[in-house]
A protein has these predicted regions:
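Short terminal interaction segments
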Residues: 2, 85-153
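Extended, charge-rich alpha-helical scaffolding segments
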Residues: 2-90
């Protein structure tokens, strides 16, 4: 059975697996960028930090493009197979030889999502703690000015 551009459903499944693998790799790269971001924040290298933030934006944009391609391919494959465009549905309607790369890619994507979520949480906590410390220092400095002490005498 063939679909768009004379692709067989096996070839379409392979393309879908490749896109999902690319999505996982993009998330893993993004997690690496978040680790670099934390190092740059600690080192106060603001020029490099701005460059890294632009790289993070590109990474997110690339991922969204891959996600749209995944949705398109999954929709086509599901239409050919007569099922919902969910990975579990698609995989259950394919032979094991054809579904294994898809299932493996989906598993890797899930692991990548968990890894990225962990990196976001670590970065978020670091920024929250930094803000709290900054607020504490400012509060202490304000307290000094209200104590009657004057630098001018």
């Amino acid at each position: 059975m063939t679909v768009e551009g004379d692709l067989t459903f096996r070839e379409l499944a392979r393309k879908l697996a490749d896109v999902i693998e690319a999505m996982a790799l993009k998330l893993e790269d993004t997690a690496g960028l978040l680790k670099k971001e934390r190092l740059l924040l600690a080192g106060k290298d603001y020029a490099s930090l701005q460059s890294l933030l632009k790289e993070l934006e590109r990474s997110v944009s690339d991922f969204l493009g891959l996600e749209a391609e995944r949705d398109r391919l999954a929709g086509q494959l599901a239409c050919v197979l007569g099922c919902d465009p969910k990975m579990s549905e698609i995989a259950s309607n394919l032979e094991e030889e054809t579904s294994k790369p898809l299932v493996d890619a989906a598993d890797r994507l899930q692991r990548s999502i968990k890894g990225l979520k962990s990196e976001f949480e670590i970065t978020s906590r670091l920024l929250d703690e930094s803000k709290k410390l900054g607020d504490l220092v400012l509060s202490q400095l304000r307290g000094l000015t209200g104590s009657g002490f004057s630098v001018r005498g």
